[in-house]
């Protein structure tokens, strides 16, 4: 791994992050005020696949911006933009240019086969939301979770996930599982880190030293929930055009994403 950027480069990056969040927050507030996806009638699908980001409320360890929880917005919108470019170039999937942001309680969620949530160590699902997510998954939906790290955040994730599936275990996805071979042969298991961790000379955050690919399956062996624990694929997509982020890790993050998409669309 290359050495971390100099202090000036770090300061420049964090200044950019601050400016970026101000722009993102303004865009999200405008969407909410306009009732687009988060308030009024959500937009209908225009393609066979859309990137759908799950809106959720933070739990005890969450953050907020002017009253709006914001853990769920991490890496938005650059992650979506680069995800779209990657899937478009690497597959023949008809992917919509416009990503979606939906509450799990929105009926429109059933129009989309693939759902993404980030920083789920901070989320909190009430009983209504948990029941709706269970229904979505039981009816064939696919749920990818990403960018949460360490013991405390794992416990936060499991607390809400057990409301969704109190009767289904979370297990390690085996190397022979179809999801790792449906398009790309994903035999390489390396930790895909966030850029902030890389800048500090590590590939992990908190005490999340070991990466895990875990999942929840239905009664027929279909993977319903893909759990990327102690990893940050969203950062790898977001920084795909940043020379400071290692290209091999970006490439691997894209391959995992493409396999998840193809699996979701065919199972």
For the regions a language model picked out, list residue spans one by one.
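Aromatic-Pro/Gly-enriched surface loop or interdomain linker
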Residues: 35-114, 118-121, 224, 232-267
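Stable alpha-helical elements in mature extracytoplasmic
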Residues: 79, 83, 129-132, 153, ...
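An acidic, glycine-rich "communication" segment
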Residues: 59-67, 153-234, 238-239, 249, ...
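Bacterial N-terminal signal peptides
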Residues: 22-33
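Short alpha-beta junction capping motif
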Residues: 51, 109, 114-154
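Surface-exposed patches in mature extracellular/periplasmic domains of secreted proteins
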Residues: 93-103, 145-148, 168-176
């Amino acid at each position: 791994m290359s050495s971390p950027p100099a202090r000036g480069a770090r300061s420049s990056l964090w200044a950019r992050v601050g400016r970026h969040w101000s722009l993102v927050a303004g865009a999200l507030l405008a969407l909410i005020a306009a009732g687009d996806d988060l308030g009024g009638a959500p937009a209908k699908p225009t393609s066979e696949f859309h990137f759908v980001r799950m809106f959720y409320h933070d739990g005890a360890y969450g953050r907020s911006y002017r009253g709006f929880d914001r853990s769920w917005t991490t890496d938005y919108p650059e992650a979506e933009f680069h995800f779209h470019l990657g899937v478009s170039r690497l597959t023949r999937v008809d992917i919509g240019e416009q990503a979606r942001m939906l509450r799990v309680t929105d009926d429109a969620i059933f129009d989309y086969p693939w759902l993404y949530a980030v920083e789920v160590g901070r989320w909190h699902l009430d009983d209504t939301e948990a029941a709706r997510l269970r229904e979505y998954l039981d009816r064939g939906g696919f749920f990818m979770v990403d960018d949460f790290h360490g013991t405390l955040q794992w416990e936060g994730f499991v607390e809400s996930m057990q409301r969704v599936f109190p009767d289904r275990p979370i297990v390690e996805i085996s190397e022979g599982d179809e999801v790792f071979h449906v398009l790309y042969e994903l035999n390489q298991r390396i930790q895909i880190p966030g850029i902030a961790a890389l800048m500090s000379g590590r590939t992990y955050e908190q005490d999340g030293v070991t990466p895990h690919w875990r999942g929840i399956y239905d009664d027929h062996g279909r993977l319903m929930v893909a759990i990327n624990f102690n990893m940050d694929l969203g950062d790898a997509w977001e920084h795909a055009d940043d020379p400071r982020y290692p290209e091999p890790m970006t490439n691997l993050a894209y391959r995992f994403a493409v396999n998840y998409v193809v699996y979701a669309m065919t199972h």
